[in-house]
Design a protein with these regions (language model features):
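Active-site beta3 strand of CheY-like receiver
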Residues: 46-52
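Hydrophobic/aromatic residues positioned on beta-strands within the core alpha/beta folds
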Residues: 81-83
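Active-site residues of response regulator receiver
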Residues: 8, 54
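Receiver (REC) domain active-site loop signature in two-component systems and cognate sites
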Residues: 57
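Short amphipathic alpha-helix used as the core "switch/output" element in two-component signaling
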Residues: 41, 63-74
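Alpha4 helix (beta4-alpha4-beta5 surface) of REC/receiver domains from two-component response regulators
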Residues: 64, 85-103, 107-115
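Helix N-cap/capping motif at the beta->alpha junctions
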Residues: 18, 32-41, 62
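Two-component/phosphorelay signaling modules centered on CheY-like receiver
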Residues: 11-31
Length: 128
């Protein structure tokens, strides 16, 4: 089973995205963390196949979480940064190679990229 850690302070968004993943990709297990400080402990305590991190959160931004995760051994190519900002801003902030992807979480076109990532993880977990 592929394990995903979804870190975002917007509970409505995390509930929606986790529900979508559970319905569409049954071999993927989603853990939600709405508090970035609590996420630090989860990152240290468990191994994840994918992390989805919101860029803008109170107390700690997503880039600090990205740095912490990679320092504790998480492969940067298993981390996706999500934001409500425009793509150009995001790509300037996180140049290619910083992480697997930097996506606007509200743009429908960006959903296709997430679906490709989820589909790949589902296949690695033994699914169709």
């Amino acid at each position: 089973m592929g394990r995903i850690l979804l870190i975002d302070d917007d509970q409505a968004f995390t509930d929606f995205l986790a529900g979508y993943i559970r319905d569409s990709y049954p071999l993927l297990q989603v853990e939600i963390c709405n508090n970035p400080i609590v996420a630090l402990q989860r990152i240290k305590a468990s191994a994840y196949d994918l992390m989805l991190i919101d860029l803008e959160m109170p107390t700690m931004d997503g880039l600090k979480l990205l740095g912490f995760a990679t320092q504790t051994g998480m492969d940067k190519n298993r981390i996706v940064i999500l934001s409500g900002r425009e793509a150009d801003f995001l790509h300037n902030l996180c140049p290619m190679g910083t992480c697997l992807a930097v996506l606007n979480k509200f743009e429908a076109r960006q959903k296709a990229v997430l679906d490709m990532i989820f589909s790949s993880l589902q296949k690695k977990a033994g699914g169709p």
